[in-house]
Amino acid sequence: MKDVAIVAFSQSDCLAQAGAANEVELIMPQLQAVFQQVGLNNAQDVDFVCSGSCDYLQGAAFAFVAGVDALGAVPPIKESHVEMDAAWALYESILKIRMGHAESALVYGFGRASSGNLRTVLSQQLDPYYLAPLWIDSISLAALQARMLLDRGLVTERDMAEVVARCRRNALNNPHARLSGEISIETLLAEPGLVAPLRKSDCAPVADGAAAMIICTVEQAREWAVPFALISGIDHRIETHNLGMRDLCDSVSTRLAAGTAGVAQGPVEVAELYAPFSHQEIILSRALGLGADTEINPSGGAMAGNLMMASGLSRIGEVFRRIVSGDISRGVAHATSGPCLQHNLVAVLESA
Amino acid sequence: MATLAAVVGIGQTRYKSRRGDVSIAGLVREAAVNALKDADLGWDDIDAVIIGKAPDMFEGVVMPEIYLTDALGCNGKPMLRVHTAGSVGGSTALVAASHVQSGMFKRVLTVTFEKQSESNAMWALSTPQPFSVHLNAGAGGYFAPIIREYMRRSKAPYDVGIKVAVKDRLHGARNPLSHLQLPKITMQEVEESMMLWDPIRFLEACPSSDGACAMVIAAEELVAQSPKPPAWIRGVAMRSEPTMYAGREEVSPQAGRDCAADVYRQAGISDPRKDLDCAEVYVPFSWYEPMWLENLGFAPQGEGWKLTMSGATSLDDGGDIPWNCSGGVLSSNPIGASGMIRFAEAARQVRGDAGNHQVEGAKLALGHAYGGGAQFFAMWVVGAEKP
Amino acid sequence: MNDQVEDITGIETPVYLHYHFTAGSAPARFLRRIKEGVLTGQRCPRCRNVYIPPRGSCPACGIPTEDEVVLPDKATVQSFTVVAIPIPNNPIKPPFVIANLVLDGANISFIHLMSECDNSEVHIGQRVQAVWKPVDEWTYAMDNIRYFRPIDEPDVPVDRIGTLATTGLET
């Protein structure tokens, strides 16, 4: 199977509100950044483009169509789109490369969740007949999951606060972070509940922004003479939508995907996990079988800033950065979609 | 170096304005079950599921793959949801095919759908956008001026669109799945129907349908496991261009021409009219048949309408290049599925499985879908023979 | 007593979601000017085409458009259709004309209403001018212009539409 390499990655700052910036204005700087990293001009210089976004975040159908205006798509280009986090747009692009119809691809994701009330918008992901009319928001669902974990003695509130504190501390090294800093466990635990047992700090701060990545064959990476990281394994799995029919305290799909992607076939020096809530990082790390040797979310993860529709791609990008900088030679990145970790993607990255 | 892949099962639902007997999950499952039955396979034979549909706003379900995984036997498997506006039915088929063609999967299920009766597509397509003039124009309001420009350039007679409207509905009358069953439709009836967006009359526009379409696509090594003849995928292509830019050719978009050239090259087609036996082409407004005949290279520029008027695209007239024998988008239009229906109907033709709308001896067929402001194109060529 | 009770096969579940909408930086500059009654386009630094309403980038080149160009409110009909479907909350009665209009000095069209015209006389190349709402009704929107009406100027040849300078067709 053809090896796919990541050669460029860029992410915007995680902004609480992007202000007066439309899709095109959010995306363009990130596209220009990745083109510059490789020495390209615009989408004409790659063989395929795939993006990830969700109309409902912005409240306008066809939000992604606006994004095409940022590409320089004249003459016409090969372009596609998934209504999902851009990590899945990356997946679609890998298929394109592996079937030999592209040597390179541009992947990007973007979202302006600040336009609407995200937790309410996401309630409309639920079964439209039985659940959506109840308007159960995403934070409440995560809180249910956290409650189960606590009641079963699988985590403590202190464990959750430790995730938050560690991520915020790590985020001090992340220039794009929305939230970073030293904060004590006691301070965190003293916060009142937002939707108990979740405190506001347990919820990754949602951010507007965009992220972009360029991938290609190893031959193309060598031709461009740029440093790269190999995607040595990637897989994703979805679980039942019925919350009562799966074990919310475990992530079976993450474990399955990790197996196929070959996580355990080598040391996991770094793991960037897309955990929109602190307790979910713990669930994921256990499902991936991560040990004390793995540094989890050195970028701060989504706790530093949750770029809706791009956070998954960003996790992959953060591992890529650490490989090409020489910090590590092998890492794992994860992306999630749906309520309570319903759908999970796992990628294993290695140095060339 | 792509793995050879083929369509080994096709399933559709009867297209109607309202399927009040099934939920959205029930609708997609019906098509999926039909496809599995057609392929003589079970849920466990499927490695991944790829779904597609038009904007979530149509039914108001955000990211519906999350809700539909159970209905499609996808728990514990990979699931992807493609969305490329109106061409989504086609691009979903292409993304599904790429799962197999990449060598990463052996057999996948792909489903597209729209339950328009549970949504308000007109509203979703024309939601008042702040700061913009609200014209409630919808798709018709966008395409009518372009059609008018085609008519001006080509000097086509006024009734070309009417002829297509009749032809496609007569084809649809041969197809028991078709939403519109109008075996007695006449040119006069179409001409007298209400003008909606001049020059598009009511009967020259597509209906709004509930429906789903599914296919099972398998790698070469597994094709023989399914009893019916396969439709080998001989070419796949997609192209996009911006909605609007200075100097954009809107009547015959470059993206469409480039996409066709790419798919023809892969399939070894040099003269589409001669080399193809039939085509299922996305024609939601009747005039788009002559326009796409030119855009896709079946007729020289300015002469697509002559091909239509000659009866060449009519199965009933014994035309040499029948288009939309299934009835096309003009007979059934569940928006998210319409593109895949074109791809699936092209596959049915080369499998010899198109029932009463079969083109005798069809060996090579084109499936075509487009979307957005005629800016997103997805096409495939399928054949009875391996390449 | 009602013997016939229909099975319930569906429920109506209204979804109300509130959004704060932003037009974007480049469109916002355009909107601030249109509130003053001034139409402005933005020019692409590479291909030099002028876009109105601007969206922040030249779609063909994929780069930001910055230079502001003030445009007159005269335009040419590039294409049009006659619509039979009414617009909610708009007094205009079907059948009415919506047209793709190219302002003098711009290189792309935008869609707007035409009125004060005989629908059957609307044609490609026709010259039109904006009819604005009263000043006190002006806001951040293209519909400060109520509609465009035909003016007495020579038609623009089809191959010149979209290429005129801000001064219009030279005589």
Language model features with spans:
Chain A
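Claisen-condensing/thiolase-fold acyl-transfer catalytic domains that form or cleave C-C bonds
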Residues: 21-24, 28-29, 53-106, 110-111, ...
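Generic N-terminal amphipathic, Lys/Arg-enriched alpha-helix
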Residues: 3-19
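N-terminal glycine-rich anion-binding loops that anchor highly charged ligand groups
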Residues: 1-8, 33-47, 55-69
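Flexible, glycine/charged-enriched surface loops at secondary-structure junctions
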Residues: 42-45, 155-161, 174-180, 227-228, ...
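N-terminal leader/propeptide and maturation segments of large enzyme subunits in energy/redox metabolism
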Residues: 136-184
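Flexible glycine-/small-residue-enriched beta->alpha junction loops
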Residues: 105-153
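Short catalytic helix/loop segments, enriched in acidic residues and glycine
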Residues: 18-40
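Phosphate/pyrophosphate-binding loops at sites that engage ATP/ADP/AMP, CoA/4′-phosphopantetheine
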Residues: 32-47, 149-156, 222, 257-269, ...
